[in-house]
Amino acid sequence: MNLKSHLTDIVEPDFGLLDELLSLHVLTLHELADVRSERTVYKRNNALLELLTTEDQCDKFVTTLKRTDQQHVMNYITQNGGQKHYGIVTLSVMLN
C-alpha cells in the first residue's frame, strides 16, 4: 500500500482539518466545498490529497495534522516514505 492510499484511510478531515487548511489558504472556499461534498471519508481524503500539489501546501498539511490532534498521521508520514529534511516533511512528490 502506498503512502497516499494509506493516508486516505487514516486522516480525519471532518473535525477541524479542512477549516484549518482553509484558514491557511491551502484550500479555497470552492475547493473546501468540493472536498466536503464527497460522500465518504475515504473520498474526502482522496479529494483533499489531490489538491496538495506544492511543497508549501504539503508542509501546511503536515503542520495542520499536528494542530488537529492527528500527530499519529504525521508520525506515519515521516516513518513510512516521507522525507524529513530541515524539520519539514516533503510529501508532495509521494502524493502525486
Where are these regions (language model features)?
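Death-fold homotypic interaction modules
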Residues: M1-N96
